Amino acid sequence: MQCALYDAGRCRSCQWITQSVNEQLSAKTADLHRLLAGLPVEQWRTPIGGPEQHFRNKAKMVVSGSVEKPLFGMLHRDGTPVDLCGCPLYPASFAPVFSALKPFIARAGLTPYNVARKRGELKYLLLTESQFDGGMMLRFVLRSETKLTQLRAALPWLRAQLPQLRVITANIQPVHMAIMEGETEIYLTDQHALAERFNDVPLWIRPQSFFQTNPTVASRLYATARDWVGQLPVRHMWDLFCGVGGFGLHCATPQMQLTGIEIAPEAIACARQSAAELGLTRLHFQALDSTQFATAQGETPDLVLVNPPRRGIGKPLCDYLAQIAPRFIIYSSCNAQTMAQDIRHLPNYRIQRVQLFDMFPHTAHYEVLTLLCRL
């Protein structure tokens, strides 16, 4: 993939960009083999790739510059701003949004936050696009609520320019630290969630719910999990760290009892909305800590699916799963190193199959799906 920002030395986020996609996949596969060395794997599935560019459904832009000439992108360690509007990872549909937002910031008087001076209001712009219908969600991350009245007053102009903006919010992040968002979310539109659809499964994206940034590969990941579960005798399933319910909603059948657990209430609201649309009455989603939920249960499901953050599921949950011994565990991971550590804490399981998903092209990162069967 060609990138003018990389060629000019202005951005190095895509550290593997000079390698071909095949070379990248080979290196990632070798890394996964190395991490699982000593753990017998019955079946290595062919890695799944996706588009080289224009695949991201989300932009996270630091806002710098002035209110008259804002700049969207990132800041180097020395404070030098870099305009990332031309990043080739973004779809072409993002360009007109960035173009309209620059004069809008002046209209609304949203002075970009100056890190060195600790002054200004607008810290970040967070933009998400639905692959289903092209609808978008835009979040203004502000230092305070000072400019909310001006922001609301200027919004009709922006919505006239960009009718694809379905969900608009102001997120309040008052701390002088490189934290992307705060706890307070103020909705500026009647619609609170962005509609998405993977493999004919309705999904919803809310401002403070995690959602995969590579929808092409994510849809194949969910479809693969559904295929694997469909081949197993599963009537009762837990979906831990479930997010908006992508895995559970794909895997569930009308006959299956499924409980999805996620600590973020916004994500659980999305999952419940999808389950209601699908008419799946035996799906139950709860906003709880996954480890605390699992270890408090007195029953053993047929299958436990885990999709933890990069830190993995950890030894306490591994020990509990080893104790209750569900027949199957499906582990989806964005950090194969912690996944391998966790699997080594499950000695009464064998790895039946492993498949790599290239969710993050041009970087060393990847997603991996692993099926574990009880010995």
Swiss-Prot record:
Residues where S-adenosyl-L-methionine binds: Q212, F241, E262, N307
InterPro entries: 23SrRNA_MeTrfase_RlmC, MeTrfase_TrmA_AS, MeTrfase_TrmA_CS, SAM-dependent_MTases_sf, U5_MeTrfase_fam
Record keywords, A-Z: 4Fe-4S, Iron, Iron-sulfur, Metal-binding, Methyltransferase, rRNA processing, S-adenosyl-L-methionine, Transferase
NCBIfam families, per the entry: meth_trns_rumB (TIGR02085)
Catalytic-site annotation from UniProt: C334
Gene Ontology biological-process entries: rRNA base methylation
Gene name for this UniProt entry: rlmC
Protein name: 23S rRNA (uracil(747)-C(5))-methyltransferase RlmC
Catalytic activity: uridine(747) in 23S rRNA + S-adenosyl-L-methionine = 5-methyluridine(747) in 23S rRNA + S-adenosyl-L-homocysteine + H(+)
Superkingdom, natural source: Bacteria
Enzyme Commission (EC) number: 2.1.1.189
